[in-house]
UniProtKB/Swiss-Prot annotation:
Induction: Expressed in the late phase of the viral replicative cycle. GO terms for cellular component: host cell endoplasmic reticulum membrane; host cell Golgi membrane; membrane. Contains putative leucine-rich repeats (LRR) and a C-terminus cysteine-rich capping motif similar to domain structure of host TLR3. GO terms for biological process: symbiont-mediated suppression of host innate immune response; symbiont-mediated suppression of host toll-like receptor signaling pathway. Residues 1-31 form the signal peptide. It is a single-pass type I membrane protein. Residues 261-329 are cytoplasmic. Residues 32-239 are extracellular. It is found in: Host endoplasmic reticulum membrane; Host Golgi apparatus membrane. Highly glycosylated. Keywords: Disulfide bond, Glycoprotein, Host endoplasmic reticulum, Host Golgi apparatus, Host membrane, Host-virus interaction, Inhibition of host innate immune response by virus, Inhibition of host TLR pathway by virus, Late protein, Leucine-rich repeat, Membrane, Signal, Transmembrane, Transmembrane helix, Viral immunoevasion. This is Transmembrane protein I329L. The chain crosses the membrane at residues 240-260.
Length: 329
């Protein structure tokens, strides 16, 4: 009986040794909108993605699906890649390939990324900065059926998700928080939220409370980083704010000058109207009278307020000149 058992053990080990995981990788060419297959190397139980110089420069994405690879890493299959090939891609799909850490390809994510699918891997840590960029850019992101840890390294992620839950998580599918998998103390629990068996918002509150208790310095760091990012985002608006304030000051000054000019003009006009209708003598303290026996052209005005006579030549008007001329005739 023991010999039969040993025989089947050796037979099973031999068969499993002969089975090699199948890997299919394709890259996307943007010109004709088609996917092309590409051979992927498997070396020492490691999947090697194509090198940068072997992919066309106009490639817009990459798709790599690993078949017959257990995402629990029972086959001890890991994936290695050149991050430089991901910088210009708009579409990244690496499924069932046993990736453990998404932060390794963080440098490869560019602003052009419009689709990210990393399902059925063994992701244990996600950099919240990557997730923040994907959420705010409304990029379709598929991360469920992974294995996020409930330890210190994911505390920034939980802080960010709780802080941005009402604003940004609405843009992602509902299964993002419902079907993503978490692990606690290396006990893998899939297809639902573990770490206390609390779904959604309650789970985030539970995790953030745990992180604040155990690692309070991480909470301060994350808040500072978020505040710093918001400040940097507002700094881009500073020139526009300065220009708007300057324009407002100039317009206010212009209106003030116009108002001042209108007031001054109105005041000067009323003064001219008064002078045109009311005679203001040059010497207001004097009273004048004309002698009747004198001619108007040579009339002498006597001053009755003083003892001295100061003859002032009276200049007749045009009508008086006409009257005097008619009398002479």
């Amino acid at each position: 009986m023991l010999r039969v058992f040993i025989f089947f053990v050796f037979l099973g080990s031999g068969l499993t040794g002969r089975i090699k995981p199948q890997v299919t990788c394709k890259y996307f060419i943007s010109e004709n909108n088609t996917w092309y297959k590409y051979n992927v190397t498997i070396l020492n139980s490691s999947i090697i993605l194509p090198a940068y110089n072997t992919i066309p420069s106009n490639a817009a994405g990459i798709s790599c699906t690993c078949h017959d690879i257990d995402y629990l890493q029972k086959n001890n299959i890991s994936i290695h890649y050149n991050t430089s090939i991901l910088k210009t891609f708009q579409d990244i799909r690496i499924i069932r390939c046993g990736m453990k850490n998404i932060s390794e390809i963080a440098g490869g994510f560019g602003k052009e990324l419009k689709f990210l699918d990393l399902r059925y891997n063994d992701l244990q840590v996600i950099d919240y900065n990557i997730l923040r960029k994907l959420i705010r850019s409304n990029t379709p992101t598929y991360l469920y059926y992974n294995n996020l840890m409930c330890g210190k390294r994911n505390c920034p992620l939980y802080y960010f998700l709780l802080k941005q839950e009402q604003t940004y998580l609405k843009r992602l599918p509902q299964f993002f928080l419902r079907r993503i998998s978490f692990s606690n103390n290396n006990t893998y629990l899939y297809h639902f939220l573990s770490c206390g068996n609390k779904p959604g918002h309650e789970f985030l509150e539970y995790q953030t409370k745990y992180c604040r208790t155990k690692f309070p310095e991480i909470n301060i760091t994350v808040n500072q980083l978020i505040a710093k990012k918001n400040t940097e985002r507002y700094k881009s608006c500073y020139p526009l704010v300065f220009i708007s304030i300057l324009c407002s000051c100039i317009s206010f000054l212009f209106l003030f000058i116009c108002l001042l000019r209108s007031i001054c003009k109105k005041y000067s006009c009323t003064k001219q109207d008064k002078s045109s209708h009311n005679y203001i003598p040059l010497i207001p303290s004097y009273t004048f009278s004309l002698k009747k026996h004198r001619h108007p052209e040579t009339a002498v005005v006597e001053d009755h307020t003083t003892s001295a006579n100061s003859p002032i030549v009276y200049i007749p008007t045009t009508e008086e000149k006409k009257v005097s001329c008619s009398r002479r005739k």
